[in-house]
Amino acid sequence: MGEQLSPDEKFQLITRNLQEVLGEERLKEILKERELKVYWGTATTGKPHVAYFVPMSKIADFLKAGCEVTILFADLHAYLDNMKAPWELLELRVKYYEQVIKAMLESIGVPLDKLKFVKGTDYQLSREYTLDVYRLSSMVTEHDAKKAGAEVVKQVEHPLLSGLLYPGLQALDEEYLKVDAQFGGVDQRKIFTLAEKYLPSLGYTKRSHLMNPMVPGLTGSKMSSSEEESKIDLLDKNQDVKKKLKKAFCEPGNVENNGVLSFVKHVLFPLHSEFVIKRDPKFGGDKVYTDFEEVEKDFAAEQIHPGDLKASVELALNKLLDPIRKKFESPELKKLTSSAYPEPSKNKGGVKGNPKQTTDDDEVIPSRLDIRVGKVISVEKHPDADSLYLEKIDVGEEQPRTVVSGLVAYITEEQLQDRLVVLLCNLKPQKMRGIESQAMVLCASIEGEPRKVEPLDPPEGSAAGDRVYVEGYESGKPDDELKPKKKVFEKLQVDLKISGEFVAQWKEQNLMTKLGRITCKTLKGGNIS
């Protein structure tokens, strides 16, 4: 996308509309040799709001300049920042952020195939990263850590140790994502300077830092995901947008800390080449502006009324939000939204930490399945059936379960012995040739001549009893026993597939454990049963 641009032109595009750049010369040197690698990270806390269009518009610039762009969903950071995201909701929040950020990018015409999306805990729990956290903690003073997080981490009277770790982890992300530059809001500046100071002490390269301005919230302060009154949510309905804008701080002639005016400057103008003030003909009629300075000048001179400014912003904003709202009308994304951000009242009568728990026994959702990692302790042929194996499988309970599987034609006893498998554990026990089977080994299969079958593979390092879940359905409580007449598994099984990347999925949502994805070795596109 940036092949026709010179290094200087790429630099201008990368740095336009930024408030500050640290390490400009490093950027210029890299651009003379190759494309720039940059990342933008977001802690998965409260719901993303309209100010997120500021970094989205810059990501569009980076791609136009030929940059390799990584978007980091910083789930661990969301927990470290005074537990703004509870541990049991982290996976759901990541999934929500991924869907809504992608919807935002699509709404402004950014191609998703040019972006790389990464979840923080995919690498931040590794041995190497953890060791670097300890190494860094032996160098960074409490003063420096507290100072670095002052404008990002929630400030409390007695700060938690987690908040002091936060800036150092963000610094390490630059190394582990293998980028040349980190992009973020100017409120991240102290974390960026901490990274520049300490990464070289670990033997790592100093990175450049790109900072966009912060958009004031509707109350005149920083727009914040965790402060409802300060921001407009991306899924707010038209009437909610109108109501919030009506309450917004916007004094006649006052251009300081004016969240509505700032939104025009930092969001609408970078995305569009013009902005239209809509007003009654008796007050001059509609007026088209092609640069922000003219809007600011007319507002300061009170030639633009706050009511007309708000009404015009409302119209432009709803055009941006409409495709995002439409995408989130799907049942799956509605369910994801309510699960990732449960209403406080919904938790009162249920089990703490289970926002998905429901009294509706007829709702067919994957959290009703009790799927676990199991380890095959012993395997032998069924005494009365040549096509069946009789296995003892440890699923993390006091005693191993007896399982009968029709796998003789597809896998040898030696291959099954001591193997980790994935089991459905809450089917009603069923006798197979006289022996009761207490679970089912889940396998991928492809029909044909010959039929191909492979047991699913848990992530490396898994242990017997590890829970397996579908992304977006982590918090539900499995049925004690699936009632055969309800055919819950049969209904869900229709949408259980192996993806093109050999990942087990339900309706394109990954089957996971706490350590990663459930996979199979070779049966791309296979069914799961």
UniProtKB/Swiss-Prot annotation:
Catalyzes the attachment of tyrosine to tRNA(Tyr) in a two-step reaction: tyrosine is first activated by ATP to form Tyr-AMP and then transferred to the acceptor end of tRNA(Tyr). The nuclear localization signal, which mediates localization to the nucleus, is also important for interacting with tRNA(Tyr), suggesting that it is sterically blocked when tRNA(Tyr) is bound. It is found in: Cytoplasm; Nucleus. Residues 365-469 form the tRNA-binding domain. It comes from the Eukaryota. One of its GO terms (molecular function) is tRNA binding. InterPro entries: aa-tRNA-synth_Ic, NA-bd_OB-fold, Rossmann-like_a/b/a_fold, tRNA-bd_dom, Tyr-tRNA-ligase, Tyrosine-tRNA_ligase_regulator. One of its GO terms (biological process) is tyrosyl-tRNA aminoacylation. L-tyrosine binds at Y39, Y166, Q170, D173, Q188. The gene is yars1. Keywords: Aminoacyl-tRNA synthetase, ATP-binding, Cytoplasm, Ligase, Nucleotide-binding, Nucleus, Protein biosynthesis, RNA-binding, tRNA-binding. One of its GO terms (cellular component) is cytoplasm. A motif (Nuclear localization signal) lies at residues 242-247. PROSITE patterns: TRBD (PS50886). Belongs to the class-I aminoacyl-tRNA synthetase family. A motif ('KMSKS' region) lies at residues 222-226. Its main location: cytoplasm. Homodimer. It catalyses: tRNA(Tyr) + L-tyrosine + ATP = L-tyrosyl-tRNA(Tyr) + AMP + diphosphate + H(+). This is Tyrosine--tRNA ligase, cytoplasmic. A motif ('HIGH' region) lies at residues 44-52. Residues 335-362 are annotated as: Disordered. Its EC number is 6.1.1.1.
